[in-house]
Amino acid sequence: MANTLEQFKSITTIVADTGDIEAIKRYQPQDATTNPSLILKAAQIPEYKHLIANAIEWAKAQSDDLAQQVEDAGDKLAVNIGLEILKIVPGRISTEVDARLSFDKAGSIEKAHKLIKLYEEAGIDKSRILIKLASTWEGICAAKELEKEGINCNLTLLFCFAQARACAEAGVYLISPFVGRILDWYKKDTGLEYSAAEDPGVVSVTNIYNYYKRHGYKTVVMGASFRNTGEIIELAGCDRLTIGPALLEEMANSDTPVVQKLQAANEVVAPGAALSEAEFRWEFNQDAMAVEKLAEGIRNFAIDQGKLETMLKAELEA
């Protein structure tokens, strides 16, 4: 009998949520996702030293201004790690826009263009890249523009239905609704423990998946942020799931049978009118968990981006 991971791959596309190339080689996912925290972690792997050195050298050639060099080195390093991953995965890499641009539509679009250009200069077509943006109103609007240009986007830090609905209405290629961070909030708020089937994060992704399929939206649903394999098993049948190496290993070492839980709707119903900005902001604001977790997620990614830049600045000044 195939292990749990292999069974799962026959139902749902598995994506590796890591910048660790050795882990990606081990589990052979279709795609991979990175974020500022994972890039920071990857930058400390000794085997990646040459990628940092290349980013530093490139940044110095672009500008004499130290602040600009730091920014350029950060972008180039994220792309360098993405390029290494693309040598292994047959599909796509998700590379994230600086979290400090989460409320800046024009800045997000400009950064996306820069990242795509760096990949293209390295011989990688934009069809293999997903630009990751936070699911703020501005991030969703930036994604809408980028999708029109043929640049596919992955909308992340997605915690509630209003965010998911706005992404579908914007024609976004893929969303990453979070599971584990939703569970964290509810456990802290209620003091309760939840079974995998009752897990508020699992329920959220299931509802989003069902809504998308019922209304015929093409946006890919890729569940993210898992705390245990129980959550993953409950979402068997989701379009894609992005999973960290520790849980991938647990699945590879398990023979728990996998049963498809999510199924596409048989009948498609036309959706209603799109959410206005005011409606989106009000609906989002009504969800205390989503408000808190989005803000926290953006802050934490920005902190890790800052740590990475401090490290790169020291290298540039050396």
Curated annotation (Swiss-Prot):
Keyword Cytoplasm: yes
Keywords, alphabetical: Cytoplasm, Pentose shunt, Schiff base, Transferase
Pathway where it operates: Carbohydrate degradation; pentose phosphate pathway; D-glyceraldehyde 3-phosphate and beta-D-fructose 6-phosphate from D-ribose 5-phosphate and D-xylulose 5-phosphate (non-oxidative stage): step 2/3
GO cellular component, one term: cytosol
Gene3D superfamilies xrefs: Aldolase class I
Catalytic reactions of this protein: D-sedoheptulose 7-phosphate + D-glyceraldehyde 3-phosphate = D-erythrose 4-phosphate + beta-D-fructose 6-phosphate
Transmembrane segments: none
GO molecular function: transaldolase activity
Family the entry assigns: Belongs to the transaldolase family. Type 1 subfamily.
NCBIfam families in alphabetical order: PRK12346.1, talAB
SUBUNIT field: Homodimer.
Protein name: Transaldolase
Phylogenetic lineage: Bacteria, Pseudomonadati, Pseudomonadota, Gammaproteobacteria, Alteromonadales
Gene: tal
